[in-house]
């Protein structure tokens, strides 16, 4: 495995963790809160953003305008069944989600959720590192590379791993600050 390829894999894990963080609710309205929601539409699970326009007219409201008015009921149901804790208001044309301020208890829960997501990202990075180190050891065993080259590669792999986990820690700190800021 080439170092550039390895760096790319680790970067993708960091980006996936960032996207996961975006789905965690803070006190402000954000359309990415609805990224994980899928709706049963003509027998298939379809992402909500494929079925409607999602906007945030102000800091405490999300407005969902379905492309097909026949799907408004199923969209409303999918939001109600999600773990977001939001109650949809359907006026027949659009669905409004009012984002209530978070309680201190809910903020603590969300910080824990963010911590779990960060840990999942770090595990993914460690798995990438493990696979890369195994590959280097295999090449060394087959005499494709020298012992010194293997050691240098393993050090480079570790540097990339440290950079990626540090980036996830930075993202986590920023998300925790965002969640706990009233």
From Swiss-Prot:
- UniProt keyword Translocase, yes or no: no
Localization of this protein: Cytoplasm
Q: Which InterPro entries match?
A: Ribosome_recyc_fac, Ribosome_recyc_fac_dom, RRF_sf
Which cysteine pairs are covalently linked by disulfides here? none
Gene Ontology molecular function, alphabetical: ribosomal large subunit binding
Show the CDD domains listed in the entry: RRF
The answer to whether the entry has keyword Cytoplasm is: yes
Highest rank taxon of the organism:
Bacteria
Record's keyword terms, sorted: Cytoplasm, Protein biosynthesis
Q: Name one GO cellular component term.
A: cytoplasm
From its record, what is one biological process in GO terms? translation
Q: Which Gene3D superfamilies match?
A: 3.30.1360.40, Ribosome-recycling factor
Family designation: Belongs to the RRF family.
**HAMAP family xref list:** RRF
**Protein name listed in UniProt:** Ribosome-recycling factor
What species is this protein from?
Synechocystis sp. (strain ATCC 27184 / PCC 6803 / Kazusa)
């Amino acid at each position: 495995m080439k170092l550039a390829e390895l760096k790319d894999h680790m970067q993708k894990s960091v980006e996936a963790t960032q996207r996961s963080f975006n789905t965690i609710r803070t006190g402000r309205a954000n359309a990415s809160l609805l990224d994980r929601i899928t709706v049963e539409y003509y027998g298939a699970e379809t992402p909500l953003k494929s079925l409607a326009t999602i906007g945030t007219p102000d800091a405490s409201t999300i407005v969902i305008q379905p492309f097909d008015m026949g799907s408004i009921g199923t969209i409303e149901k999918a939001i109600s069944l999600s773990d977001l804790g939001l109650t949809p208001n359907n006026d027949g044309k659009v669905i409004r989600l009012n984002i209530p301020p978070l309680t201190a208890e809910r903020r603590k829960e969300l910080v824990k959720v963010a911590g779990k997501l960060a840990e999942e990202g770090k595990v993914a990075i460690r798995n990438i590192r493990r696979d890369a180190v195994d590959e280097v050891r295999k090449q060394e065993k087959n005499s494709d590379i020298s012992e010194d080259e293997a050691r240098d590669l393993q050090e480079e792999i570790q540097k990339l791993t440290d950079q990626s986990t540090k980036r996830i820690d930075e993202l986590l700190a920023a998300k925790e600050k965002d969640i706990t800021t009233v």
